[in-house]
Regions:
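Hydrophobic ligand-binding cavity/cleft-lining segments
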Residues: 5-72
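Short coil/turn motifs at beta-sheet boundaries
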Residues: 28-30, 84, 112, 125
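Beta-strand/loop substructures that line and gate deep hydrophobic ligand-binding cavities in soluble
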Residues: 107-161, 177-179
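Amphipathic alpha-helical segments that line or abut small-molecule/effector binding pockets
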Residues: 44-47, 160, 164
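Glycine-rich portal/gate segments that line the openings of hydrophobic small-molecule binding cavities
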Residues: 54-55, 66-110, 161, 165-180
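Short, surface-exposed coil-to-beta transition loops
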Residues: 32-34, 87-91, 112-118
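A short, structured loop/turn motif at beta-sheet edges
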Residues: 40-44, 95-99, 120-129
Length: 182
């Protein structure tokens, strides 16, 4: 579908000259999955680790190229950039509510996908649950391939690996596979 819009081009004397432009509107090619992790610590201990800086403590192969933050850690309007295929991913924290154990981010890989990530922690005794939702929308041919490969099974495996890494850190204070690392 093509929608039309008018843009002001320039003002000449008392006349306004408009430029006609077109935009393409299409239905989204999107995949959304949610997974519930069971984490071996309460939300107050887990939530600070859901941060682009603190994640380097527990997640293998996680190292942002740049973090833009007034506090130096996760906060609303924090922006960070990570390596990604085929280039870089730009992340933006749009909601950061430590009092509710909730964080929401956007992740854009130009010409590939736009993603919304939501994480909600829920207390469960001395532990907590983390309900994690990724919603990927294609914004190009490479995104169509990615969305097709973002299956429930691939997401479950990704979430289980993340859960194992985070639980290992919560139990030992070290990254999985790095117990004896300096």
């Amino acid at each position: 579908m093509v929608a039309r819009r008018w843009r002001m081009w320039k003002v000449v004397g008392s006349s306004v000259i408009f430029h006609y432009a077109a935009m393409r509107i299409t239905k989204p090619n999107r995949a959304t999955h949610t997974y519930r992790q069971r984490l071996c610590a309460p939300p107050a201990r887990v939530f600070p680790l859901l941060c682009p800086v603190r994640e380097t403590e527990w997640a293998a192969d996680w190292l942002p190229d740049l973090v833009i933050s007034s506090s130096g850690i996760a906060e609303r309007d924090c922006v960070f950039i990570t390596p990604d295929k085929p280039g870089k991913a730009i992340w933006y924290i749009i909601s950061y509510k430590p009092e509710d154990w909730f964080v929401e981010m956007l992740r854009i890989v130009p010409k590939v996908t736009a993603c919304r990530l939501e994480i909600q922690l829920t207390p469960n005794g001395d532990e907590c649950f983390a309900d994690i939702t990724y919603s990927h929308t294609s914004i190009g041919a490479a995104g169509d391939e990615f969305v097709a490969s973002f299956t429930a099974d691939s997401y479950r495996k990704f979430m289980q690996a993340w859960e194992a890494e985070l639980n290992h850190f919560l139990k030992t204070g070290s990254r999985l596979g790095h117990d004896n690392a300096p």
